[in-house]
A protein has these predicted regions:
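N-terminal low-structure segments adjacent to metalloprotease catalytic domains
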Residues: 1-198, 329-391
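Metalloprotease/metallohydrolase-associated module, dominated by Zn2+-dependent proteases
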Residues: 233-261, 265-269, 285-391
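Surface-exposed, flexible loop/turn segments at secondary-structure boundaries
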Residues: 123, 202, 319
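Metzincin-family zinc-dependent endopeptidase catalytic domain
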Residues: 111, 130-290
Length: 391
């Protein structure tokens, strides 16, 4: 009996050693700490690593200059995260443009070229339902230029989806089981499908962690997820349940101005979440080089601190992918049309001012400054000027 216990103890010790070894592998930017520091300690990328992430050195085309020009002014570098931030608690390897081109590419084809946005159990104020969804379509169309964006009405039987009930009458759905059902709703011409829901979600996948650092508590209401993506089926589901101010304050405000302000807040957050998930469907992973729309987040405060625009690294990934489909690459695989980024920024700025006046004021100002800077550089300045990455 004692021998069997001793043998079992040795096996458990060996198993923990193997798990710890696998779990404590270093990557370029993270190393493992104990729970008193957060699970991971993020090492901020150096200026050289940020420059190499979008890999424009040595290129003299206006396209490469429009990506990298004054990038230190318009794109803030990623800073050291706090103890509760995403990068301190999740393992992120990052993804350079070169890595994306080799391993993460989700190719656009003639048969699959439509981005679908599908609402699921939408219970927002009926007066805003159609306008809310239309806003998502307009922003996605402007943001991912040349792509076709359509609204897809789906009817998923939620009776077979795993869920949790709570004493206050609320419930959560298992995002993994919904992902499996979404794949069957994808049209034949669908490049990707992003499902937007007002239902609270949770993700029941557990990561193997050393036993001395973690315990598995019973399910509780704050165990939730904002989004879940499948790179196998190219479908995504994102929940705006906790973006709604009424999630915290159950009683709707009597003041009409306050009601409109709350709706604008919900619209802005939802738009950022939808655009981010479409970016994931292009094969982009969470960005770790700059403050970027594609940064991972674990709380609403962290999400609100993220910009609406993607960084130079992610921007080049998107442009190269779309340009490959529309024959805009030269013999070296580089984008030929030098005005693409300028035209995209200008189109987004005009759309924000025309369709969303008063909602995206900060973003509109950023785009205006970016457009003016690019105009001076691309059309007035010296086109053959060497890029300075050492600012």
């Amino acid at each position: 009996m004692e021998k069997s216990k001793k043998k079992k103890k040795e096996e458990n010790k060996e198993e923990d050693t193997i798990r710890t070894y696998e779990y404590m592998k270093w990557n370029k930017f993270q190393k493992v700490h104990g729970p008193e520091y957060g699970l991971y300690h993020f090492q901020v990328p150096t200026p050289q690593q940020r420059k190499e992430s979008f890999d424009c050195s040595g290129e003299t085309t206006l396209f490469s200059k429009s990506i990298s020009h004054e990038y230190t002014k318009f794109y803030k570098p990623m800073k050291a995260p706090g103890p509760n931030d995403w990068l301190m608690n999740h393992k992120e390897y990052g993804q350079t443009f070169r890595e994306y081109s080799r391993f993460g590419f989700h190719e656009i084809t003639r048969k699959k070229k439509v981005i679908y946005i599908a609402p699921l159990s939408f219970n927002i104020n009926p007066a805003f339902d159609q306008s809310f969804l239309t806003a998502m379509i307009i922003l996605a169309q402007d943001y991912y230029y040349d792509m076709i964006v359509k609204l897809l009405n789906i009817n998923i039987d939620l009776s077979g989806v795993e869920y949790r009930n709570y004493e206050d009458g609320s419930y959560q759905l298992n995002a993994n089981t919904i992902i499996e059902k979404l794949f069957n709703e994808m049209p034949d011409d669908g490049y990707c499908l992003v499902c937007l829901t007002d239902i609270d979600l949770y993700n029941n996948v557990r990561v193997i962690k050393p036993r001395k650092w973690i315990y598995y508590p019973p399910p509780y209401k704050n165990d939730f997820c904002y989004e879940l993506n499948s790179f196998k089926y190219w479908v995504s589901i994102c929940s705006i349940c906790r973006f709604d101010p009424l999630y915290v304050v159950n009683n709707p405000p009597d003041d009409d101005d306050m009601h409109i302000k709350m709706y604008f807040s919900l619209l802005k957050r939802s738009a950022k979440l939808v655009l981010k998930n479409i970016g994931h469907m292009f094969g982009l992973k969470n960005c770790i080089f700059f403050k970027c729309l594609m940064n991972g987040f674990g709380s609403m405060e962290e999400f609100d601190g993220r910009p609406m625009e993607i960084c130079p690294c992610c921007l080049r990934k998107i442009f190269t992918n779309i340009s490959r489909k529309f024959n805009r690459l030269d013999d070296n695989g580089r984008v030929e049309n030098d005005k693409l980024i300028y035209d995209r920024f200008k189109k987004i700025k005009e759309s924000l001012d025309k369709n969303f006046a008063g909602i995206f004021e900060v973003e509109s100002k950023w785009y205006q400054e970016r457009i003016e800077s690019l105009y001076l550089e691309l059309f007035i300045g010296n086109k053959n000027e060497e890029l300075n990455y050492d600012k």
